[in-house]
Swiss-Prot record:
Superkingdom assignment: Eukaryota
Cross-referenced CDD domains: GT3_GSY2-like (cd03793)
Residues annotated as binding UDP: 39, 331, 515
Species lineage: Eukaryota, Metazoa, Chordata, Craniata, Vertebrata
Modified residues annotated as Phosphoserine in this record: 8, 11, 412, 641, 645, 649, 652-653, 657, 698, 709, 711, 725, 729
Residues that hold alpha-D-glucose 6-phosphate according to the record: 291-292, 294, 297, 301, 501, 582, 586
Residues where Phosphothreonine is found: 700, 719
Record note on quaternary structure: Part of the GYS1-GYG1 complex, a heterooctamer composed of a tetramer of GYS1 and 2 dimers of GYG1, where each GYS1 protomer binds to one GYG1 subunit (via GYG1 C-terminus); the GYS1 tetramer may dissociate from GYG1 dimers to continue glycogen polymerization on its own.
Protein name (Swiss-Prot/TrEMBL): Glycogen [starch] synthase, muscle
Catalytic activity: [(1->4)-alpha-D-glucosyl](n) + UDP-alpha-D-glucose = [(1->4)-alpha-D-glucosyl](n+1) + UDP + H(+)
Length: 735
C-alpha cells in the first residue's frame, strides 16, 4: 500500500508551540532502554544525542534506566550518590533485597543521570519471574534464549524500581516511563499489569518480524496485510520475542515509531496503529562560516588519499585529483542494507565510465563489520611501502635543500648535475622497485574467516571488480569499525564521512537510517530509498531532494533490476558533476541539517509525553492534538538557482575549499546565472522556521500553571485506532 500523504504524522508545522505554562514541576521522566551507556546499535545514538534536549526540558527530573555493564560504567559513567532522599531510599531498599542497583551520570553531552540495574546479579529470581510472566501475560520464554531471559530480568527489575520509587515518595509524582524496543518492553507490560500510576510510552525503532522477513528475500511491503504473523514468527523461532514486542505496543498509553514507513509496518505486524511518529535527530553543530566544513572535507579527503596511495601501490595509474570516494556503512545485513544493489550498480557504473572514456575514477568503500582474524598482509605492506617512499622523498628533499641553500648563500646558482649524487639515485631506484607488484590491490583489508561464502566477496567475484588497472571503479571492503588508532586507515567514522564525496545507502529495510542523516549534517550528499524512514521524511519535507544532495532511490514500486539501473544513473550523474557543482551541492546539503536537529525533532517526543500524561492522569492533564490547515503544509523549497547543481553560476564568496578551485570551463561570467550562496542560505534557514500557525489552546495542567484549554473527553484518547499526532496535517496530495 502506498504511503498516504493526506495524513502526515511527521510535518513540522503540525506541532504545538509548547510554553513554560505547562507545569512539569511534579513530574518525573524515566527513559528505559537496553542501550543506556551500552552501545549495541542505533538506539544508543538516539539516546545519546537526544539527552541534552530532553534534559533541558525536564531538568533534574529526567533519568535514564539501563543495564549495568562493567565496560560501560568504567568508560562512560561517573558513579554518584542519588540527589534526592526518595531516590536514595529506593536504591537502598532494592540493594538490601538482593539486587545491585547503581546510580551515576552518563558522561555525554547534557550529562543525564542514569540508574543502572545489574541483570546478572538478579539471575537467582529468573525462574520465578518467568513463571509470573506466564501467569500474568501468557508469554513463555525458552531457557536457551539468553537475550530474552535478560529482557525478562531487566523488565522485572525496572518495574520493581518504578514501584519502589513511587512508594518512597510521600507526594506521588506524575511518572512518565518511556520504553525503547522489545528488550525493555516487559517492564511496560508489568507496570500496567500491576496497575502502577505511570504514564507509559513504547517506541519501536524496528519491528522484530519485519527485520527477519526482509532478510528472507520476500516482497515485504507489498504483502504486509497478507502475512500470518504468528506463523511467520513461530517458523523463525522468535514467537516469544514477538509476543513481548506486541504486548508492549498494546499495553502502552502511547505507541510511537520512528518513521511513517515503520508506522505502516507496525500497524500490520503488531496490530496497533502508532499514535505519533517520532523521527530521530542529531545534535547539529553549526559552523560560523560556510567555508569551514568545506575545509574539513579537504583535510579529511587528504587522509583518505594517503590510505589509497598505499593500498594501490604499484597500480596507482589514476589521478587522485579526479577520484571520487563513495561509501556504504552499517550493520552487515547484505540485502537489508542494500549492499547487493550497490555492488551491481558499481559494476554497471564501471562499464559506463570505461565505454565513455571517462577520466574519473571511483573508489567505493564498504564499512561493514564482519568476522575476521587479522589484517591482510598485502594491505599492511602497502602502507609500509607508502611510508618508505615518503621517508625517502623527505631525505632527498633535505639534502637537495641544504645544497641549494649553501649555493645561494655564496651568491651563485647551483650546478644541477651536482645537486643529487649517486647515493641519492640509488635510494630512489630502490624505492621505485619496492612499489612493483604482480597481483592486483586487495579488495578486502582483512583476512575473512568465511572468505568463500562471504556475500560481498562472492558478489565481487561474480561481477569481476578486482581493482585492475582497466577498472574505473575500485572496491575496498573494510570489515571493521573505523578507528583513529588503526594502522591501516587511521581515521574515525566522522572524519571518514567528511572526506568522502557520496554516501550510498540503498536499503530495503531501514526504519530510520542514521547514516544518511549523519552525511547530511556533515554536508555530504547521500543516496537513500523510499523504504527508509529518512528517505520518506526528506521526500515529504523537501520539494526537490536531489537539488540538495539527497537522492531518493525507488525500491518500493520498481523491480530490483530497475532500482539498480536508477542507482547507476544517480552514480553516473554524480560522476559527471564538476568540482564546483559538488561544492555548491555540499553547501546546500549542509543547510538541511536544521531539519534533523533535535531542537526541532525533539518536539515529537515532547508531544508523545504530553499525550501519555493526559491518558494516564486525565484529572490533571488534558491533551488536544493540533491540526494544521491544508494551506500550512510544510515543504522545504527548491533552491533559487537553476539547474539543481548549476555549472553556470558565479560564487559570490570563497566558500569552497582551497584545493577545489577550478576554472569555469571557459564560460564568461555574463553567460551564467548570478549565484549568491549567502543569500540562498539565508532564505533556506528562514524556511525551516516558517510558516507560523495560529496558536490554539491544547494543554491543561491542573497541578500548576495557567489553563490553556477546556477539558477534553479523554475516553477518545484511550483507543489506538486513529493516530492522534500533533503533526497530523491534512495536506494536499503531492506527486
Amino acid at each position: 500500500m502506498p504511503l498516504s500523504r493526506t495524513l502526515s504524522v511527521s510535518s513540522l508545522p503540525g506541532l504545538e508551540d509548547w510554553e513554560d505554562e505547562f507545569d512539569l514541576e511534579n513530574s518525573v521522566l524515566f527513559e528505559v532502554a537496553w542501550e543506556v551507556a551500552n552501545k549495541v546499535g542505533g538506539i544508543y545514538t538516539v539516546l545519546q544525542t537526544k539527552a541534552k534536549v530532553t534534559g533541558d526540558e525536564w531538568g533534574d527530573n529526567y533519568f535514564l534506566v539501563g543495564p549495568y555493564t562493567e565496560q560501560g560504567v568504567r568508560t562512560q559513567v561517573e558513579l554518584l550518590e542519588p540527589p534526592t532522599p526518595a531516590l536514595k531510599r529506593t536504591l537502598d531498599s532494592m540493594n538490601s533485597k538482593g539486587c545491585k542497583v547503581y546510580f551515576g551520570r552518563w558522561l555525554i553531552e547534557g550529562g543525564p543521570l542514569v540508574v543502572l540495574l545489574d541483570v546478572g546479579a538478579s539471575a537467582w529470581a529468573l525462574e520465578r519471574w518467568k513463571g509470573e510472566l506466564w501467569d500474568t501475560c501468557n508469554i513463555g520464554v525458552p531457557w536457551y534464549d539468553r537475550e530474552a531471559n535478560d529482557a525478562v530480568l531487566f523488565g522485572f527489575l525496572t518495574t520493581w524500581f518504578l514501584g519502589e520509587f513511587l512508594a518512597q515518595n510521600e507526594e506521588k509524582p506524575h511518572v512518565v516511563a518511556h520504553f525503547h524496543e522489545w528488550l525493555a518492553g516487559i517492564g511496560l507490560c508489568l507496570c500496567r499489569a500491576r496497575r502502577l500510576p505511570v504514564a507509559t510510552i513504547f517506541t519501536t525503532h524496528a519491528t522484530l518480524l519485519g527485520r527477519y522477513l526482509c532478510a528472507g528475500a520476500v516482497d515485504f511491503y507489498n504483502n504486509l496485510e497478507n502475512f500470518n504473523v504468528d506463523k511467520e514468527a513461530g517458523e523463525r523461532q522468535i514467537y516469544h520475542r514477538y509476543c513481548m514486542e506486541r504486548a508492549a505496543a498494546h499495553c502502552a498509553h502511547v505507541f510511537t515509531t520512528v518513521s511513517q514507513i515503520t508506522a505502516i509496518e507496525a500497524q500490520h505486524l503488531l496490530k496497533r496503529k502508532p499514535d505519533i511518529v517520532t523521527p530521530n535527530g542529531l545534535n547539529v553543530k553549526k559552523f560560523s562560516a560556510m567555508h569551514e566544513f568545506q575545509n574539513l572535507h579537504a583535510q579529511s579527503k587528504a587522509r583518505i588519499q594517503e590510505f589509497v596511495r598505499g593500498h594501490f601501490y604499484g597500480h596507482l595509474d589514476f589521478n587522485l585529483d579526479k577520484t571520487l570516494y563513495f561509501f556504504i556503512a552499517g550493520r552487515y545485513e547484505f540485502s537489508n542494507k542494500g549492499a547487493d544493489v550497490f555492488l551491481e550498480a558499481l559494476a554497471r557504473l564501471n562499464y559506463l565510465l570505461r565505454v565513455n572514456g571517462s577520466e574519473q575514477t571511483v573508489v567505493a568503500f564498504f564499512i561493514m563489520p564482519a568476522r575476521t582474524n587479522n589484517f591482510n598482509v598485502e594491505t599492511l605492506k602497502g602502507q609500509a611501502v607508502r611510508k618508505q617512499l615518503w621517508d625517502t622523498a623527505n631525505t632527498v628533499k633535505e639534502k637537495f635543500g641544504r645544497k641549494l641553500y649553501e649555493s645561494l648563500l655564496v651568491g651563485s646558482l647551483p650546478d644541477m648535475n651536482k645537486m643529487l649524487d649517486k647515493e641519492d639515485f640509488t635510494m630512489m631506484k630502490r624505492a621505485i622497485f619496492a612499489t612493483q607488484r604482480q597481483s592486483f590491490p586487495p579488495v578486502c583489508t582483512h583476512n575473512m574467516l568465511d572468505d568463500s561464502s562471504d556475500p560481498i566477496l562472492t558478489t565481487i567475484r561474480r561481477i569481476g571488480l578486482f581493482n585492475s588497472s582497466a577498472d574505473r571503479v575500485k572496491v575496498i571492503f573494510h570489515p571493521e569499525f573505523l578507528s583513529s588508532t588503526s594502522p591501516l586507515l587511521p581515521v574515525d567514522y566522522e572524519e571518514f564521512v567528511r572526506g568522502c564525496h557520496l554516501g550510498v545507502f540503498p536499503s530495503y529495510y531501514e526504519p530510520w537510517g542514521y547514516t544518511p542523516a549523519e552525511c547530511t549534517v556533515m554536508g555530504i550528499p547521500s543516496i537513500s530509498t523510499n523504504l527508509s524512514g529518512f528517505g520518506c521524511f526528506m521526500e515529504e519535507h523537501i520539494a526537490d531532494p536531489s537539488a540538495y544532495g539527497i537522492y531518493i532511490l525507488d525500491r518500493r514500486f520498481r523491480s530490483l533490476d530497475d532500482s539498480c539501473s536508477q542507482l547507476t544513473s544517480f552514480l553516473y550523474s554524480f560522476c559527471q558533476q564538476s568540482r564546483r557543482q559538488r561544492i555548491i551541492q555540499r553547501n546546500r546539503t549542509e543547510r538541511l541539517s536544521d531539519l534533523l536537529d533535535w531542537k526541532y525533532l525533539g518536539r515529537y517526543y515532547m508531544s508523545a509525553r504530553h499525550m501519555a500524561l493526559a491518558k494516564a492522569f486525565p484529572d490533571h492533564f488534558t491533551y488536544e492534538p493540533h491540526e494544521a490547515d491544508a494551506t500550512q503544509g510544510y515543504r522545504y523549497p527548491r533552491p533559487a538557482s537553476v539547474p539543481p547543481s548549476p555549472s553556470l553560476s558565479r560564487h559570490s564568496s570563497p566558500h569552497q575549499s582551497e584545493d577545489e578551485e577550478e576554472p569555469r570551463d571557459g564560460l564568461p561570467e555574463e553567460d551564467g546565472e548570478r549565484y549568491d550562496e549567502d543569500e540562498e542560505a539565508a532564505k533556506d534557514r528562514r524556511n525551516i522556521r516558517a510558516p507560523e500557525w495560529p496558536r490554539r489552546a491544547s494543554c491543561t495542567s491542573s497541578s500548576g500553571g495557567s489553563k490553556r484549554s477546556n477539558s477534553v473527553d479523554t475516553s477518545s484518547l484511550s483507543t489506538p485506532s486513529e493516530p492522534l499526532s500533533p503533526a497530523s496535517s491534512l495536506g494536499e496530495e503531492r506527486n
